[in-house]
UniProtKB/Swiss-Prot annotation:
InterPro entries: ATP_synth_OSCP/delta_N_sf, ATPase_OSCP/dsu. It comes from Oenococcus oeni (strain ATCC BAA-331 / PSU-1). The lineage of its organism: Bacteria, Bacillati, Bacillota, Bacilli, Lactobacillales. This is ATP synthase subunit delta. It is found in: Cell membrane. The keyword Cell membrane applies. One of its GO terms (molecular function) is proton-transporting ATP synthase activity, rotational mechanism. It comes from the Bacteria. Belongs to the ATPase delta chain family. F-type ATPases have 2 components, F(1) - the catalytic core - and F(0) - the membrane proton channel. F(1) has five subunits: alpha(3), beta(3), gamma(1), delta(1), epsilon(1). F(0) has three main subunits: a(1), b(2) and c(10-14). The alpha and beta chains form an alternating ring which encloses part of the gamma chain. F(1) is attached to F(0) by a central stalk formed by the gamma and epsilon chains, while a peripheral stalk is formed by the delta and b chains.
């Protein structure tokens, strides 16, 4: 994910948190349900973000999707449509969820590993994340990414601890390049 996308995702989540106020939990719940629709139909977000889809078609879809939702949620969906950012919905909802959890001194920590982790490893990572990130309660969600090679990348909101072999190899490569460049 590009740095600019991360900034956009953070901005959306922060704005949603601010605008929804005491209704944040409700808005988050509504968006999680809507996210399931997009999760089941992967091409839907790309289609809605496509410039060939007219504003009227987007509005019609939002009318159906947002039926029964709060005004804040509907307005947010309209903003995503206007900016053609439906493809970022999953990450925005995840970011908002992390912000809500953090405001309750609870955090969802993403543990990116090359292979699935065991329940025992999840407990150990939870304790490590509590100490490193400063949360009282931590829920660990494992995301498998073969690019990690080995080790783990822990992410809580905008904070990351990269203990992956891939990162260590990149650092080693940079040190070697610097050493060779100085000779």
């Amino acid at each position: 994910m590009a740095f600019n996308e991360n900034r956009v995702i953070n901005n959306y989540a922060e704005a949603l948190m601010e605008v929804s106020g005491k209704q944040t939990a409700k808005v988050l719940s509504e968006l999680q349900v809507i996210e399931l629709v997009f999760e089941r139909n992967k091409e839907l977000a790309q289609t809605l973000d496509d410039v060939s889809v007219s504003s009227q078609q987007q509005e019609a879809f939002i009318g159906i999707l947002g039926k029964g939702c709060s005004t804040t949620t509907k307005n947010f969906l309209e903003t995503l449509a206007d900016n053609r950012h439906f493809s970022l919905l999953e990450e925005i909802v995840e970011n908002l969820d992390q912000r809500v959890s953090a405001s309750n001194n609870h955090s969802l920590v993403i543990a990116k590993t090359a292979i699935p982790i065991t329940a025992e490893q999840s407990k150990r990572l939870s304790k490590i994340a509590q100490k490193k990130f400063g949360y009282q309660h931590v829920e660990v969600k494992n995301v498998v990414d073969p690019n990690v090679i080995a080790g783990v990348i822990l992410t809580a909101g905008s904070k990351t601890i990269d203990g992956s072999i891939k990162n260590k190899l990149v650092q080693l490569n940079n040190h070697i390049k610097q050493a060779v460049g100085k000779e």
